[in-house]
Swiss-Prot record:
Name of the protein described by the UniProt record: Aerobic cobaltochelatase subunit CobN
Family: Belongs to the CobN family.
GO molecular function, one term: cobaltochelatase activity
Organism (species): Pseudomonas aeruginosa (strain ATCC 15692 / DSM 22644 / CIP 104116 / JCM 14847 / LMG 12228 / 1C / PRS 101 / PAO1)
GO biological process: cobalamin biosynthetic process; porphyrin-containing compound biosynthetic process
Compartments in which it is found: Cytoplasm
One of the record's GO cellular component terms: cytoplasm
């Protein structure tokens, strides 16, 4: 060990001996709270020169035995009196407490007191001062303030050191009080005297402890910065917003001051997550969360994540439960001054002027939204555009973004905003936008531009960027005149104004300007054209607020800190302190949280698309009919049965369904027909989307009924009464004796056949799948009848309760969503409070997320993985291991798993729980709080199988939001790696030993070799996001699968763990992937699928491409279906892709739903083609006939082709190009006549 001088803030960066460099003194005061130390150091300034010698220290700086022993030897053994103020109890500093007790036994006076407001009898009993006197010293510290601190010293000298000092008893400070830097007992009148008439009042809430610690300089400074922005500050010190008396007084001051806004610096949450509809404050004003960071400023500047885990929980995640708008850190703990008298560094909260100015300006802009007439407000709607093609404008997952934008514009016009000349439809809106410049470089020079920024104005804005940002842009992109958006001395901006309201196309990220950057530059800085767009919005257009419409744009994913951004972070530098309002799908808390935390967004959550059953169509329906006829004929007409068997075989082979299903066809149909039955039933009952959501509209008619059934299908909450699943309740009421959500669909039905089910459907009733279908139809029938005022049969007790819940709660909340979405958006634009609400997938039992229109929050990361997630993860892990053993004849030992932050938030940590279960490790939760406190290693004898060596590839948002889970999993990995178990039972330990030996043989130091050998968590470069594969595919910057593997490795080759925060580790990442036997990704809901998003092919497809390229051989790939929490399923990735193509992608029902949405519907068809081709490029799992199915359904079907041509002709070209490209690359290996048909179609489209 080596001696190490401690850093301000008590942070000891390694296990060296902390040396406080203090000399002996009569009185030593140890406080685990920096606020107490700062107060006592400040009060010590006023002590007379002859006061006993004094030392102040933080025991948390002395974290190991050697550090404690050194301090005892140098300081404590010489002290006459030792006072210890310890927060959290003896367990937080046990060895140190033991040494203090030993000193007391040798004659020192020991006064241990709690470090907070709660008595600690165990700690207090260790002292040797009478309890009454010890209690008094605790009260001095507990009440705080300079007066009490001064009396504390006087009392200590008098009572414990034999000095002649008069002293007074501790005086209680108010639990809530106004603060004024010039008045000891501030009043509202004191502040009124300072305020400027007509300015909005901003209440500034801060902890009473700052007042108690005399650490108010940063609060006074923030008041000055607020005033500089034209605001009247009203600082309020309080103990806790959860204390009713404190809250009542705060409410009173808010009303009396007519506060326009609240800036809150207190941590945690005021609201109850179970009742988020209860507003934190009665006053209908926004609440901004300003962060008083527990870290020091240099640590924050150097940390690519920004805030540490404690700050993330206290000042970000938990305040989001209250609907607070997350802003920036305004102060940091730091060395304020050196107390020579106590030989201690005084650590206080220090103001950060630049970040304070950001928050103050943001506060002013929110206050202005409430004061400015709507007719004078300038609002800009921003539509995302990626890929950067004209057929893909208006990204918004599950959202008809053009129609949503039009609904928003209409609502604004109705409320008196300056909106004029609106188009008749969303499709027409896009057509008008494409009359001007866009991100499409091919036609850029041929189109007019409706607004632009003069080069001189651009350069003036550019000059205001931080130096590092300016240099990065110039080094990467050169001068702005070289940018494609530069024309005739101006920087062009894509979009149109409707009246004074702007609709713009968000600029491209930059990879289309330099496609090769996708291989080596995951944190690419945005180009000049990107900067010009946001410069124009802020400084030329002078927007009062931005609306980024739909999940999601690219602003919140630009390089920079994960949370607690600095001025050099790109989202901060470009958006600045502008109000950002973000309509966002309710089932994606993770990516919504990214926008909230990096672009101060207020989320207005919206519904997922209407949901429905896939049902049967085309050859699937024909097969179902033939199978039914075969079973009937096999009993009555064997010759007819044989003929039907032949027809079934022909139909199966013609449609390649035998390969999709994996049927082993033989002369005995009994060996494969049940499997066919099960497959057809599974497809028919699959949940798919029926169209898209339109912001501001709830589903109606059939869409409403189908969606309600989807919401009632699985249990909610406790699964009892009205929360039970409707299908299972019907099955129970009818005495069917099975669970329709967890059955073998192909198994013969031997149960009862109630008349009410006999009436449903005209098809034969043979299998459990047929019974499930009849229950679905019965449920839909009674949903409609109950909503029409009828009551179900009195004997239906279980389903009757569910249907009553439907009428009383579920249907009304669904119906309320459309109006609530518009109301929430208008409230935000009027500078009012948008209530918080939970987030999640409604069809997975999360009906508490309805109605939408709220500013959703995510989860308390300290509680993850939850016990429910552990149950699901453990069950899914076992299913995976069983499936692999069954198919490969040996246990799975090496697995790669992709883990996303948004899925972790939705599920409470299914994926991490599954990874821990595979390792053979179980979380340990604290009693009462349910926070994860530790883990325990399960013995191999209990597992009854080998442990699995799991390698994680985490998303960038997971890295930013779940540092605690990274540390938990890393700790579990290292613990398992140290077990003394046989290689065949613990492949992780064996591999770590082998890698360590290899690295040491190459000259790596033993400790470093062990660290690298234990790396099992990899992700993107700090500050960067994504897997990179999309860029390579979109820009067609690849030739072989190995090229895509290279991109995946380059983007993901950074190691994370307790001792690593993005350490470059590409070689180790490749070595890990080369060892894998299988690749897994889980999906937690059915409100989307694998061909709906680029993320699935980037993460799982990319990993599979890398693994198989490195190994030179195929490996297993699995898809975990966690959409029904009580019934997780494991399929191969190929099986899941097959299901998605049949159930959704080429399903006429889904295509018809898209046709209701014009431009965006055609966009969705093109996206499906893109994602299918990309999945094949990465995974090589798409068959030729599946390309043909999409070509037939989208391009060669005359009606669908004409729909696309009319509404989104660019999408028609994009689809034809992509399928022709698939043929050229050999993905679609034998296209036959499709080659000529598609090439001719492409020529026709290009001519048009």
């Amino acid at each position: 060990m080596h001696l190490l001088r401690t850093q301000p803030g008590g942070f000891v960066p390694d296990d060296g001996i902390a040396h406080l460099a203090q000399t002996p003194a009569e009185l030593v005061i140890l406080c685990s709270g920096d606020s107490h130390l700062a107060l006592l150091a400040e009060a010590a300034r006023a002590l007379p020169d002859d006061y006993p010698s004094l030392r102040l220290a933080n025991p948390m700086q002395l974290q190991n035995h050697a550090s404690v022993d050194l301090y005892v030897e140098e300081v404590l053994r010489h002290a006459r009196v030792i006072l210890l103020s310890l927060h959290g109890g003896i367990g937080y500093w046990r060895y140190g407490v033991e040494q203090l007790v030993a000193l007391a036994e040798r004659g020192a006076l020991l006064i241990p007191v709690p470090g907070d407001d709660r008595p600690d009898p165990e700690l207090s009993a260790l002292g040797n001062l009478p309890a009454e006197q010890a209690e008094r010293f605790w009260q001095y510290l507990r009440q705080g303030g300079l007066e009490n601190a001064g009396q504390f010293y006087r009392c200590l000298a008098s009572q414990c050191l034999g000095r002649d000092y008069a002293w007074r008893e501790p005086q209680a400070l108010p639990r809530v009080a106004l603060f004024h830097p010039r008045h000891a007992e501030a009043t509202l009148e004191h502040w009124r005297a300072d305020w400027q008439a007509g300015r909005p009042v901003v209440a500034l809430l801060f902890y009473r402890t700052h007042l108690q610690a005399a650490n108010t300089a940063f609060i006074a400074r923030f008041c000055e910065r607020l005033a500089a922005q034209g605001l009247n500050p009203l600082p309020i010190a309080l103990a806790s917003l959860k204390e009713s008396a404190c809250l009542a007084q705060v409410e009173d001051w808010l009303e009396r001051s007519d506060a326009a806004l609240i800036v809150n610096t207190t941590g945690f949450a005021q609201s109850n997550p179970e009742a988020p509809e209860l507003r934190p404050f009665r006053r209908d004003v926004p609440v901004l969360q300003a962060i008083c960071s527990l870290d020091n400023r240099p640590l924050w500047l150097d940390n690519p994540q920004g805030l540490g885990p404690r700050d993330l929980a206290m000042h970000v995640a938990l305040p989001e439960l209250d609907g607070r708008i997350v802003t920036r850190p305004i102060s940091f703990k730091g060395l304020a001054w050196r107390s020579e008298r106590s030989e201690s560094d005084v650590v206080c909260y220090l103001a950060d002027d630049e970040r304070m100015d950001f928050v103050a300006e943001l506060a002013r802009r929110w206050a202005e939204l409430a004061r400015k007439p709507n007719a004078e407000k300038r609002v800009a709607l921003v539509l995302a555009n990626y890929p950067t093609r004209d057929g893909r404008i208006g990204n918004g997952v599950g959202l008809d973004t053009p129609a949503a934008a039009l609904n928003i514009l209409r609502a604004l016009r109705q409320q008196g905003y300056p909106v004029d000349g609106l188009p008749a439809s969303g499709t027409e809106l896009i057509r008008q936008l494409l009359g001007g410049v866009s991100n499409d470089l091919e036609h850029l020079d041929l189109r007019p531009c409706a607004q632009s920024l003069a080069l001189d104005d651009y350069l003036a804005c550019f000059a205001r960027l931080p130096e590092r940002n300016r240099q990065a842009v110039l080094a990467r992109w050169g001068e702005p005149q070289q940018d494609p958006m530069f024309r005739d001395g101006r920087m062009m901006v894509a979009g149109l104004r409707y009246g004074l309201t702007f609709v713009g196309i968000q600029p491209a990220r930059g990879y289309q300007l330099d496609p090769a950057a996708v291989y080596h530059d995951p944190d690419l800085v945005p180009p000049h054209g990107y900067l010009a767009f946001y410069f124009w919005l802020r400084h030329a257009y002078r927007a009062d607020a931005l609306l980024h419409v739909g999940k999601h744009g690219n602003l919140e994913w630009l390089p920079g800190k994960g949370v607690g951004l600095s001025a050099e972070c790109w989202p901060d530098a470009l958006l600045g302190p502008l109000p950002n309002i973000y309509p966002f799908i309710v089932n994606d808390p993770g990516e919504g949280a990214q926008a909230k935390r990096r672009t101060q967004a207020v989320i207005i959550d919206h519904l997922m698309p209407p949901l429905t059953r896939a049902e049967s169509y085309g050859p699937l329906r024909d097969l179902e009919r033939l199978a039914d006829e075969f079973y009937d004929a096999s009993l009555l007409d064997p010759r007819r049965a044989e003929q039907l068997r032949g027809e079934i075989l022909v139909l199966l082979r013609d449609n390649r369904l035998d390969r999709e299903i994996g049927l082993q066809l033989s002369d005995d149909p009994d060996s494969w027909l049940p499997q066919l039955d099960a497959y057809l039933c599974d497809l028919k009952e699959s949940q798919i989307r029926d169209g898209l959501h339109v912001f501001g509209e709830s589903p109606s008619g059939r869409l409403r009924l189908d969606t309600l059934l989807a919401l009632l299908r699985v249990p909610r909450g406790d699964g009892k009464g009205a929360n039970a699943g409707l299908l299972k309740s019907l099955a129970d009421d009818l005495g069917l004796g099975f669970d329709p959500l967890a059955c073998d669909m192909g198994e013969a039905w031997q149960g009862a056949r109630p008349a009410c089910l006999e009436e449903r459907g005209g098809e034969p009733w043979r299998t459990l799948g047929d019974t499930r279908e009849r229950l679905e139809l019965l449920a839909l029938h009674w949903i409609e009848r109950c909503l029409g005022g009828e009551s179900p049969p009195a004997t239906w007790r279980a389903s009757g309760e569910v249907l009553r819940g439907l009428c009383e709660q579920v249907a009304p909340t669904l119906d309320a969503c459309g109006g609530a979405e518009i109301d929430g958006l208008l409230a935000a634009l009027e500078g009012r409070f948008v209530p918080a609400g939970p987030s999640g997938a409604p069809s997975r039992g999360r009906l508490d997320v309805l109605p939408t229109g709220r500013n959703f929050f995510s989860v308390d990361v300290r509680n993850l993985p939850t016990p429910t997630a552990w149950r699901i993860g453990f069950q899914s892990a076992n299913l995976l291991l069983e499936r692999h053993l069954q198919e490969h004849g040996d246990h799975l030992r090496q697995l790669g798993l992709s883990v996303w932050g948004t899925a972790t938030m939705r599920t409470g940590g299914d994926d991490i729980a599954q990874a821990l279960a595979l390792l053979g490790v179980r979380p340990v939760w604290q009693a009462g709080s349910q926070r994860v406190a530790d883990f325990e290693i399960l013995p191999v004898s209990l597992l009854d199988r080998p442990r699995v060596d799991v390698t994680l590839r985490v998303s960038g948002f997971f890295r930013d939001a779940f540092a605690n889970l990274i540390r938990l999993f890393d700790a579990a990995v290292q613990a398992v790696a140290e077990l003394d178990e046989a290689e065949e039972l613990n492949p992780l330990a064996a591999r770590v030993r082998l890698e360590r030996q290899r690295l040491e043989a190459q000259g790596t130091a033993p400790a470093e070799a062990r660290r690298q050998a234990g790396w099992r968590i990899f992700g993107a470069k700090p500050g960067a996001y994504g897997a990179g594969v999309q860029g390579a595919i979109e820009e067609r910057l690849w030739e072989t699968r190995a090229d895509l593997a290279e991109v995946y490795l380059n983007w993901g080759g950074y190691a994370y763990g307790a001792a690593d925060d993005g350490t470059p580790a590409r070689e180790r990442f490749a070595q890990r992937l080369e060892r894998l036997q299988a690749v897994l990704h889980n999906q937690d809901n059915r409100e989307h699928d694998l061909l709906d998003s680029n993320d699935y092919y980037q993460f799982q497809g990319g990993m599979l491409a890398a693994v198989e390229t490195l190994r030179g051989a195929p490996v297993a790939s699995y898809h975990g279906d966690h959409s029904q929490p009580d019934n997780p399923r494991i399929r191969t990735l190929k099986e899941e892709l097959n299901r998605v193509v049949r159930a959704r992608a080429v399903n006429p029902k889904w295509i018809a739903g898209m046709k209701r949405h014009g431009y965006k519907g055609a966009f969705e068809l093109a996206a499906t083609v893109d994602y299918l081709c990309a999945f094949d490029a990465t995974s090589e799992l798409i068959d030729d006939h599946q390309y043909a199915l999409l070509a037939d359904a989208y391009l060669l079907d005359a009606e669908t082709r004409e729909f696309v041509r009319q509404h989104n002709p660019q999408a028609l070209r994009d689809m034809a190009e992509r399928l022709v490209e698939a043929q050229r690359r050999g993905l679609w290996q034998e296209p036959g006549a499709y080659r000529e048909a598609l090439e001719n179609l492409l020529l026709d489209v290009e001519e048009e």
